[in-house]
Regions:
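Residue-level signal for WD-repeat beta-propeller blades
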Residues: 21, 179, 200, 208, ...
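Active-site beta-loop-alpha junctions enriched in small/polar residues
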Residues: 465, 495-497, 531, 595
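Extracellular "leader-to-stem" segments immediately downstream of a signal peptide or signal-anchor
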Residues: 2-16, 23-197, 201-205, 209-393, ...
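Gly/Ser/Thr/Ala-enriched C-terminal appendages of enzymes
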Residues: 533-722
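Short, T/G/N/S-enriched strand-turn elements that build extracellular solenoid repeat scaffolds
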Residues: 174-176, 193-201, 411-417, 450, ...
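Right-handed parallel beta-helix
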Residues: 210-211, 259-270, 396-406, 419-430, ...
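Short glycine/acidic-rich loop motifs that flank beta-strands on beta-rich extracellular proteins
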Residues: 194-197, 217-219, 275-279, 408-415, ...
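Outer-membrane beta-barrel domain signature
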Residues: 160, 377-379, 436-437, 469-470, ...
Length: 731
């Protein structure tokens, strides 16, 4: 068990995380299935698209309240609407909430870097960097072509602990500001180096002045030196990795159980560079790996397969699950035998100790599923779970404003169990593996506005814990408005880790520009994803106004598929053609996937519930021209907006591998899509009369499986207007 340093001045006593029981989670998942029926009948889709956003530039995005305005009676965006209430609640989250006292980091010994410290990625002193200077990595991930200028400048870890390492000065200024009752810690223009986490404390605004760039150490060991948990793997921090709690490397910017905290900047010339593409090794050594190597993708960022340590390959430092002390395994079902629907007698432990249990990316979820206490889920040195760039846990009144993130190790922003969060005017610009832009996790009351996204994964992804780590409750009450998306997997995504549920989501005026459409396109515009491991629910979602001038990815891809079952599906409505490869992974404009990569999870015991989803005014244009990525066999990109327009894959009972009886697997229901023009998909085949796996049976523009009563109203696809209801059984 890790020892917590109670005298550490940077952090309070540890938070005791008590994951919700499966019974509690099931109750939360099913308690509100029918909620929102009244709102569904309000006829909001009739609001004209051109009048949707007349007030988007108003302070806080608040609408005018004049009588007779088209939004005056709108239950979502009107003066008394649900989304408007969230915006007004968060109006006080701004720089003015902090004391006017300034604490200049130069007064604490911070020094700007000499010009010689900044090295071009093509001029590493001890030799070429394989993933930057050429080869398959550069072809597959042309990072320097996709990110903004400056992303290919590196500062080696040689500067950690030198006179140019400003980490101690930054944290000393933060501590002084906190002790003084609050204030603004100011980092002036210039290039700075930080050899470890910046730990924010209550009532402190960490502020970057115009022209400021902070280069964070690329060496993982520098994030396991000063945390409050003393372990054999370093001095670690309470973190959350892919929605499972653990002790791990600290994030470059971190806070735990603080109130009134902020990271702000004068403008987007202020850069927080996580240096995830910079070699871990000092400049005197040949470069062999970086933070992004830890992803474990062969032939990318220096990963040569299983011989390269990463999250995706066997880690000998992981103790066998069957050898864990009995006192750590708190799940009473761990070794209870049961017979599953396939007639196999097994146990939870048997499922968890199958192939791949000793990979870090599987070991942490296994510890969670065994209910091992968080203080015994120890990673850090000797392990390969990358930290988020900015991670705040259990904080209240959080402001993120106007800076620019680059080269982040993992997710760019990860507020967890936070209340009252505003992210405004940030440029989330990092295209490495798992570089999601903004991932609020089990937060309550969140406003995302005026944010630009250029990411290596989902631009926005809403989370609420994975499997048993649901003690923080659902992700709820979030407004997303006036944002721009470029590259990424999903523009606006809910999931996949949503075991405690996601509810009350309001989004409007999103421009999914997708300017890199020919080389690194946005894969999906609106993405809802979960599976029988995540379970959870998605309900009460209102999306109004999404523009896609360059469509999305024109190549279809599925993200796994139902285990042991064909994924081909037709419906009796004639609106969908055969899809042997429905585009839930990429290529679908609007994609629901309740069967997301099931083979990646050893335990699949909880179906998901989706209800009351309202999508209107989504408009996608076609693009014409060559693409640099591969199209599926037999398909050629012409003048198209996507591969398939609408893909809805419900949960599949065949995936369930828990004790009998098999639980009820509800279809996706309560979804209304209206007043949309989804352009011309690559797939426009007519529905075949019988299921077929023939290559000549082209998929249609719509794919549905295990859905009920999906209402399409004035939805135009390839010139055809759909006013119909879609219902289809499971595969």
């Amino acid at each position: 068990m890790a020892a917590h340093d109670k005298d550490d001045p940077l952090l309070p006593a540890p938070h005791t995380h008590a994951p919700a029981s499966p019974g509690r989670r099931a109750f939360m998942a099913f308690a509100g299935v029918s909620a929102g029926a009244t709102l569904l009948a309000t006829g909001r889709a009739a609001v004209a698209a051109e009048s949707m956003f007349p007030f988007s530039s108003a302070p806080g995005g608040q609408p005018p309240a004049q009588p007779g305005h088209p939004f005056a009676s709108d239950p979502i965006w009107g003066p008394g609407g649900e989304a408007t209430g969230i915006i007004r609640r968060l109006a006080h989250i701004k720089p003015e909430m902090f004391s006017h006292a300034d604490f200049h980091v130069t007064s604490y010994g911070a020094r700007t870097l000499p010009a010689s410290a900044l090295i071009s990625s093509t001029a590493w002193p001890s030799g070429k960097i394989p993933w930057v200077t050429g080869g398959t990595e550069q072809t597959a991930h042309p990072t320097n072509d996709l990110q903004s200028p400056g992303s290919n400048v590196m500062v080696p870890c040689d500067y950690t602990g030198t006179q140019y390492d400003s980490c101690a000065a930054f944290n000393a200024a933060i501590m002084d500001a906190n002790r003084a009752g609050g204030g603004r810690v100011v980092v002036p223009a210039g290039n700075w180096y930080c050899g470890g986490p910046i730990v924010l404390l209550s009532h402190v605004n960490f502020h970057l002045e115009s022209g400021c760039t902070i280069y964070f150490s690329p060496n993982p060991a520098d994030y396991a030196k000063n945390g409050p948990y003393r372990t054999a793997n370093g001095n670690l921090y309470h973190t959350r990795w892919q929605a499972n709690d653990c002790l791990n490397f600290g994030s470059p910017i971190y806070a735990f159980h603080q109130t009134n905290i902020a990271v702000t900047a004068d403008d987007n010339t202020c850069v927080l560079n996580g240096q995830a593409m910079t070699p871990i090794q000092p400049s005197t050594q040949a470069p062999t790996s970086c933070w992004w190597t830890f992803k474990g993708s062969s032939n990318e960022y220096g990963c040569a397969g299983s011989s390269t340590p990463s999250q995706a390959y066997l880690n000998p430092n992981n103790v066998a699950l069957t050898s864990l002390p009995a006192s750590q395994i708190l799940n009473p079902q761990a070794n209870v035998s049961f017979t599953n629907q396939y007639g196999t007698t097994t146990t939870l432990m048997d499922l968890l100790t199958g192939t791949g249990w000793n990979e870090d990316q599987n070991y942490l979820p296994a510890l969670s599923e065994l209910r091992v206490p968080v203080e015994d889920r120890v990673f850090g040195n000797g392990h390969y779970l990358r930290p988020c760039m900015i991670e705040f846990i259990g904080c209240t009144n959080v402001l993120l404003q106007h800076y620019h993130t680059q080269n982040t190790p993992f997710w760019q922003h990860h507020p967890t169990d936070c209340t009252n969060v505003v992210i405004d005017g940030v440029f989330a610009d990092s295209v490495g593996p798992n570089n999601d832009g903004f991932d609020p996790d089990a937060c309550n009351y969140v406003l995302v506005q005026n944010v630009q996204f250029n990411t290596g994964d989902d631009c926005i992804a809403m989370k609420s814990g994975k499997y048993l780590d649901t003690g923080y409750g659902p992700m709820q009450n979030i407004v997303v408005q006036d944002c721009t998306m470029q590259s990424g997997h999903g523009g606006l995504t809910i999931g996949s880790e949503l075991s405690a549920g996601v509810q009350n989501v309001y989004a409007r005026n999103l421009t999914m520009q997708n300017e890199n459409w020919a080389s690194n396109p946005l894969n999906i515009a609106l993405r809802f994803k979960t599976n029988m491991n995540r379970g959870g629910f998605i309900k009460n979602v209102w999306i109004n106004g999404v523009t896609l001038p360059n469509g999305v990815n024109l190549a279809g891809k599925y993200g796994g598929g139902a285990l042991g079952a064909a994924i081909s599906k037709i419906t009796g409505t004639g609106t969908t053609g055969l899809a042997t490869n429905p585009s839930t992974g990429q290529g679908g404009l609007i994609a629901f996937d309740c069967d997301y990569s099931p083979s990646g999870d050893a335990v699949r015991w909880t179906p998901s519930v989706i209800s009351n989803i309202n999508i209107t005014n989504v408009n996608a244009s076609n693009v014409s021209g060559a693409v640099s990525y591969s199209m599926p066999s037999g398909f050629v990109a012409g003048s198209n907006s996507c591969f398939q327009a609408l893909v809805m894959q419900g949960s599949e009972a065949v995936d369930y591998n828990g004790p009998l009886p098999v639980p009820t697997v509800s279809p996706i229901s309560g979804v209304t899509i209206s007043n949309c023009n989804l352009g011309s998909p690559v797939c426009t085949g007519a529905a075949p009369t019988t299921p077929s796996t023939s290559a000549s049976a082209a998929p249609g523009p719509i794919f549905v499986s295990n859905v009920s009563g999906i209402a399409l109203s004035n939805v135009v696809i390839a010139g055809t207007t759909y006013n119909t209801t879609l219902t289809a059984s499971a595969t």
